[in-house]
Structures are given as C-alpha cells and as structure tokens.
Amino acid sequence: MRPGAPDLPGAPDRPGEPDRPTVTAAGEELTALVRSAQRGDRMAVQELLDLLTPYVGRLCGPIALQDGPDATQEALIAIFRNIGRLREPAALFGWARVIAVREAVRLARAGARTVADPLDEVPARGDPQLAADVRDVLERLSPAHRAVLVLRDLEGLDEHAVSALLGVPEPTVRTRLFRARRNFRKAWGR
C-alpha cells in the first residue's frame, strides 16, 4: 500500500492502478458489505459510511479548500444515493474517488466566484506552520489547478487516471499540472 493511501479493504495499492476485484478476505468482506448496503441494510450503509468518510474527506479537502467539508458531504450523499448502480463492489473506492473529485471541483469553482474566508481547519501532519503555508498557497490556485496538483502530487495518480477523473484530455492534464506547479512555486517564493 502506498504512503497516504487509505488503509481500507479493496482500495488500490498503487497510484493510477485501476480498482479490480480482489480475492482476499478483506476484498470479499467489502463485496459483501457493498451488496448488503445495496439491498438497504442500514448497518452495512453505516459501515460503508465509516469507511468512506475519511477517504472522501482527504480527497475533497485539498481541492475544495474551505468548502472541503461541504464537498465531502455532497460526495457522500451522491455515493449513497447511487450505491445501487455500482456493479462491481471491488471498484468502490475508484468509483467514490470519481464522485468526490467531481463534487470538490464543482464546489471549488462555485466558491471561486465568491470571496473566500481564510481556512481555519485542515488536518496537518508535522509542522503546523508549514501546513498553514501550503494551505495559503493552495488557496491562490484555481480549482482546476488545485485538482490536478492534488490528484497527481498528493494522491499519486498518473496522467491517464487524472484525465479520466476530471474528464479532460491528457495534454490538458499535463498543461494544468505544469501551470499549477509553476504557480505554486511562484506563490511559495522559491
């Protein structure tokens, strides 16, 4: 499992690796859990919610910034409204990632039209001042640039996976990533 990846059954082990059915006990448990949730089992829905909430929040937070909690909530609502449409339970985390990123980008774009309040709370690892500085620089990037930067550099997805998630061609991903990194470095002062 890569560093920073969700330690959850059925989650992909490598960046950009497509989710695929697993034959492990954890994979079978996840499949059974998803199938139970699809049949309306409230306990299974609650277990899935407990599994997905931190993962979806980790995806939405850096993209939607101050709207991260709202994006997380909207993504989880969309996931559970549409759980019955998920054909392959082993693909749960990839499917949830697509929904989370789309909701985060949507809310980030909507939030970009208004003046943003400073970010008060984002989970930080290590140096809190460094985390605050990174948040400040991320706030200066456009939602499209934040999304590409987070998916490539924080989530470790390849260009093809980012392209599929955002619904843009791979050359657009490369261009946005180049500009996002350049703007990040410029804002960082390095």
PLM features: residue spans?
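Internal acidic/polar
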Residues: D19, T24-L30, R106, A110-D136, ...
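Short, charged helix-capping/linker segments at alpha-helix termini
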Residues: Q38-Q46, G57-E74
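Sigma70-family region 2
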Residues: Q38-R39, P62-I63, E74-A91, A110-T114
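Short, aromatic/basic-enriched loop-to-helix "N-cap" motif that marks the start
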Residues: D70, G84-V98, E170
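Arg/Lys-rich amphipathic alpha helix in sigma70-family domain 2
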Residues: R81-E88, V98-L119, D127, R179
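DNA-recognition helix of helix-turn-helix
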Residues: V101, V105, H160, L166-R190
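A short pre-motif secondary-structure segment
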Residues: V148-R152
